[in-house]
């Protein structure tokens, strides 16, 4: 190689293999450079296309186009609060909206919450006891569902009231977050952990079942407390009877001493004046002593009662004054507790004197005299209503000359308590009767079962389609099935034959029988579950779950009567007030919405506490979320939900600005902005604390002198506290604003609330075709 380099001959240059290598290297280098040039050209082209696309996007979707959407939202914003979707929680939001508008549910939850708040205070006092630690944790976990429901109800009512008073504060949407209730459900049932889609009927049964268990737990504790109270009352009565017996003995002793004095002064014997049967004071001589003794015996037998009445005027005040001087505190505590005595027991001397009205008590204001009274009244105050305590006539310390009233022990009024404890039983729970009739001996056997919902089919079974006999269905076969047909399938007469024969106790062998299902007790609200999901015959289900959707339409009436399937004749009729719709293909996918009819607004009673934003309630007040909690919550969303990260380090892009976030679609067409922005607006006390009517503001400013100082003083007074007239004006304004929606149907799609016409609602309820959105749960209330 060193000899080849300096050579300049043409032959060597032509036959040199190194020259070919150089050419080959140059060839590869040209290819690489060409690729590099092509790559740079493509980058330039991409930059040009990106610039072009960016300009095209800016022209097609300008930032100014989002403002009409906001204006349209502001005009169409309704005074009804929606619920934010927290990650596939449409099944929970639809059920909560129905329960919120269910008649009697909110008042029952509030009553239970008041009982639980008192129980929590009692449990805090017993926190140091180790034996009852597990019971406390279980009870507090079951109590938390009621507290979460009450917290959600308060937040919804407060948000609704603040919107009606200041609608300009809410421009985007009116919704709150059921996060506390969702966390409580996850603690009670781990099935709801995560962000999977669940069945709306299952979550309804879970909520009602836990409420029922809580009511039973409270009822057991109430019965136990009443038993403890009755034992205390019995102990007090025993002590009182023993004290009364001691008082009787003292009275006997004092009367004997007095009789001895009289007998000594008159020269009579002690036996002549026993047990109060004393004779008149007459002067007798020693000569007629024997004849007078016989007269005294006959007269004492005839005038025993009369002499007692005459001498009682002289003896009783002396004994009472002596008793007051010797034992004042003991006597006063006995008199105060006399209203607990039973009149069926043997009356004592003190009760006789009280019944005659001869005793006038002198009740002082000493504190140590009332210790027993206060202890008993505190125990009774926990379990009695105010009406029961008012009936008992206890004397005030200031009355010195009032007679003592001895009353019987009155039973504790537990009517309101029982209604609160039977919230689920009264509203949602009915009773079915399963009758089985033997076809040989015609004997009947009945079995009763409780129900909270009725599961009815939406189409005929395949076996019934094959068989042409339609003995089960009372109606002829039609293409469009009705709800009455579905209920008749539920309450149909079933004939037990073949291998499934019935063992009759009278016949002592297996016989053919007929079995029917009838309604014996009907609740206030009937929940009808339409069996829209069936096991799919496909071996592989791409959607998962294994339950496919049946989109067969079912004619659903607005009014319903179950007299045909009842055990006894009844005139009760039910009206449809809520429907939970499901749109989708399988049970593990799709979206739930709720349609509710707004009724009974004339009898609407709003809580005045919801108009006071600066509340100090710790248990029932909804807890606002700070920025850190919102970060953790939003980041935990699954892939199906749109996650929005709020952080100071990560700057948001120009394309995803605040206005475009509002148009991001969530589950089921939900168009909701970020939860943290909405909650900061809803939970801002400064904006809501200054809520007042425009008319009230004008009237208040007209009464002032027109100075800025008076205006500032009035604004500060409005923020610190509002007078009673302001409360009444606000409540009347809110009620009048809500009355506009009387009888209208509202569609709750998570955070969105819309008004639907009755015609459109009926078309969606009973469609002519087979749509993907069908009714799933029907709620009828008693008219």
UniProtKB/Swiss-Prot annotation:
The modification Phosphoserine is found at residues 16, 42, 67, 473, 766. Autocatalytic cleavage of USP1 following UV irradiation inactivates it, leading to an increase in ubiquitinated PCNA, recruitment of POLH and translesion synthesis. Coiled coil: none annotated. Keywords: Autocatalytic cleavage, DNA damage, DNA repair, Hydrolase, Nucleus, Phosphoprotein, Protease, Thiol protease, Ubl conjugation, Ubl conjugation pathway. The record marks 669-670 as: Cleavage. Residues 45-55, 250-273, 284-296 have a biased composition (Basic and acidic residues). Residues 81-783 form the USP domain. Pfam families: UCH. Belongs to the peptidase C19 family. Interacts with FANCD2 and PCNA. Interacts with WDR48. Interacts with ATAD5; the interaction regulates USP1-mediated PCNA deubiquitination. Negative regulator of DNA damage repair which specifically deubiquitinates monoubiquitinated FANCD2. Also involved in PCNA-mediated translesion synthesis (TLS) by deubiquitinating monoubiquitinated PCNA. Has almost no deubiquitinating activity by itself and requires the interaction with WDR48 to have a high activity. This is Ubiquitin carboxyl-terminal hydrolase 1. It comes from Bos taurus (Bovine). The lineage of its organism: Eukaryota, Metazoa, Chordata, Craniata, Vertebrata.
């Amino acid at each position: 190689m060193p000899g080849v380099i300096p050579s300049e001959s043409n032959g060597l240059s032509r036959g040199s293999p190194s020259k070919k290598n150089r050419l080959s290297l140059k060839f590869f280098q040209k290819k690489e450079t060409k690729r590099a040039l092509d790559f740079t050209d493509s980058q330039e082209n991409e930059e040009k296309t990106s610039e072009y696309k960016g300009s095209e996007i800016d022209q097609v979707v300008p930032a100014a186009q989002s403002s009409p959407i906001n204006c349209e939202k502001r005009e169409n914003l309704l005074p009804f609060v929606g619920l934010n979707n927290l990650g596939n929680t449409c099944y929970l939001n639809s059920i909560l909206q129905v329960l919120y508008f269910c008649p009697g549910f909110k008042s029952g939850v509030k009553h239970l919450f008041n009982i639980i708040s008192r129980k929590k205070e009692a449990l805090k006092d017993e926190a140091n006891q180790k034996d009852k630690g597990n019971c406390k944790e279980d009870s507090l976990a079951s109590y938390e569902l009621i507290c979460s429901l009450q917290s959600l109800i308060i937040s919804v009512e407060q948000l609704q009231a603040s919107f009606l008073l200041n609608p300009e504060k809410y421009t985007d949407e009116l919704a709150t977050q059921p996060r506390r209730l969702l966390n409580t459900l996850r603690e009670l049932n781990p099935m709801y952990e995560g962000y999977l889609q669940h069945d709306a009927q299952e979550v309804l049964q879970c909520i009602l079942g836990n409420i029922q268990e809580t009511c039973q737990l409270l009822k057991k504790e109430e019965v136990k407390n009443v038993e403890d109270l009755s034992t205390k009352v019995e102990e007090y009565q025993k002590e009182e009877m023993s004290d009364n017996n001691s008082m009787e003995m003292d009275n006997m002793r004092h009367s004997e001493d007095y009789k001895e004095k009289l007998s000594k002064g008159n020269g009579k014997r002690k036996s002549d004046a026993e047990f109060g049967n004393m004779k008149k004071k007459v002067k007798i001589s020693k000569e007629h002593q024997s004849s007078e003794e016989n007269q005294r015996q006959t007269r004492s037998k005839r005038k025993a009662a009369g002499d007692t009445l005459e001498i009682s005027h002289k003896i009783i005040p002396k004994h009472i004054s002596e008793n007051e001087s010797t034992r004042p505190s003991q006597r006063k505590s006995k008199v105060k507790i006399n209203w607990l005595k039973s009149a069926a027991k043997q009356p004592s001397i003190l009760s006789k004197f009280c019944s005659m009205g001869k005793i006038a008590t002198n009740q002082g204001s000493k504190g140590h005299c009332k210790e027993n009274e206060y202890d008993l009244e505190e125990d009774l105050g926990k379990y009695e209503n105010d009406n029961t305590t008012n009936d008992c006539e206890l004397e005030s310390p200031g009355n010195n000359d009032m007679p003592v009233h001895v009353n019987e022990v009155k039973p504790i009024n537990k009517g309101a308590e029982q209604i609160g404890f039977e919230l689920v039983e009264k509203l949602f729970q009915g009773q079915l009767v399963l009758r089985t009739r033997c076809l040989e001996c015609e004997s009947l056997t009945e079995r009763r079962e409780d129900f909270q919902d009725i599961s009815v089919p939406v189409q005929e079974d395949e076996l019934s389609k094959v068989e042409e006999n339609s003995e089960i269905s009372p109606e002829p076969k039609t293409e469009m099935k009705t709800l009455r047909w579905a209920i008749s399938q539920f309450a149909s007469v079933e004939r037990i034959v073949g291998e499934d024969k019935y063992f009759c106790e009278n016949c002592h062998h297996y016989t053919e029988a007929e079995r029917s299902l009838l309604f014996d007790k009907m609740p206030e609200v009937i929940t009808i579950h339409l069996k829209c999901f069936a096991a799919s015959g496909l071996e592989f289900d791409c959607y998962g779950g294994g339950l496919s959707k049946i989109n067969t339409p079912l004619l659903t009436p607005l009014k319903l009567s179950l007299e045909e399937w009842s055990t006894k004749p009844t005139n009760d009729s039910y009206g449809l007030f809520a429907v939970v719709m499901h749109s989708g293909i399988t049970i593990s996918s799709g979206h739930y919405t709720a349609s509710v009819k707004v009724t009974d607004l004339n009898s609407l009673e709003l809580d005045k506490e919801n108009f006071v934003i600066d509340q100090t309630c710790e248990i029932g007040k909804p807890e606002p979320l700070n920025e850190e909690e919102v970060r953790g919550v939003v980041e935990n969303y699954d892939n199906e939900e749109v996650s929005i990260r709020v952080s100071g380090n990560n700057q948001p892009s120009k394309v995803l600005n605040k206005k475009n976030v509002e148009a991001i679609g969530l589950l089921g067409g939900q168009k909701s902005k970020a939860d943290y922005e909405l909650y900061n607006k809803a939970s801002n006390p400064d904006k809501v604390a200054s809520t007042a009517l425009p008319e009230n503001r004008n009237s208040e400013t007209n009464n002032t002198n027109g100075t800025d100082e008076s205006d500032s003083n009035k604004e500060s007074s409005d923020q610190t506290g509002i007078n009673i007239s302001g409360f009444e004006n606000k409540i009347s304004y809110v009620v009048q604003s809500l009355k506009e929606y009387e009888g209208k149907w509202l569609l709750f799609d998570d955070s969105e609330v819309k008004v639907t016409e009755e015609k459109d609602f009926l078309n969606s309820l009973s469609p002519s075709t087979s749509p993907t959105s069908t009714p799933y749960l029907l709620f009828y209330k008693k008219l």
